[in-house]
Amino acid sequence: MNTGVQDVYNLVWKLVRALQDPQKYEGALLDSYDWERRPIGRSVAQSSLHNLRSHALDMDTALGMSAEKSPEENAAAVAPFFDRELPGHAEKREAVCRAQKTLDTEFKAPGTEVGWFYPSADFWGEGRESAHGGQLKPHGTFDTEFYHASTVPGHNLPHAWVEKEGTRRALRDLVPLSAFLLLVGRKDIGWTALAREEVRVEVVGDGGWVDVDGSWGRQRGVTEQGAVLVRPDGIVAWRGEWDSELAQRWPEVLDRVLYLQGAA
């Protein structure tokens, strides 16, 4: 179900654009739903099957349980795990601990739950330089156990609390449902001029929203002169520093993150 909800978040804003301008958006932008979500869905399915098998093959075996045994026999097999006075208590606890490591992919997997990302949305290849903010281990496998907050394009916008005029909000709650959000740290160097119908600008710092505990400053991946562009589904689309030519290149950046042309 969670994966299905993620699918909807990914697709609905793309459908809105395709309905508003079919000629412009019915191609690659809609196709990107498959490019982005299919690998995630496949990974979730494989993980779910692994977890299902692990319950029977690892945990049930460690506890000494079996579908072929009677309820009384299963209860007797499990009892030493809970009662240190019974023979085999230490061995049973050790076996369960070993089995639990196998089940960490189900019960201890924040990396899997919130660290997933869309490699196809990393248009400028930033993830290759940082192993996607650490979410990939040195040998290239996905770190299921730990979540590594990152603003590499394709990743979920990290959580941070912000506050303005007595109102506290989660940073992600600032993301509009049908427009991009440009999070900037300064409002005096040109970023606000990039605002348009499809891009809302919010300032975190410099008289705008207050970064309550500094977590956004630690996670944003750019300086306070930089900015992070977020899609309506909460996925980082672009990040960068201000330069004098950015305003001229901005339409190309937007076209790229909308799968309309090559990287700008």
Task: Give the positions of each predicted feature.
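Extended, hydrophobic alpha-helical segments in both membrane/secreted and soluble proteins
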Residues: M1-V16, L29, I40
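Helical substrate-recognition/capping region of FAD-dependent monooxygenase/halogenase enzymes
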Residues: R17-A264
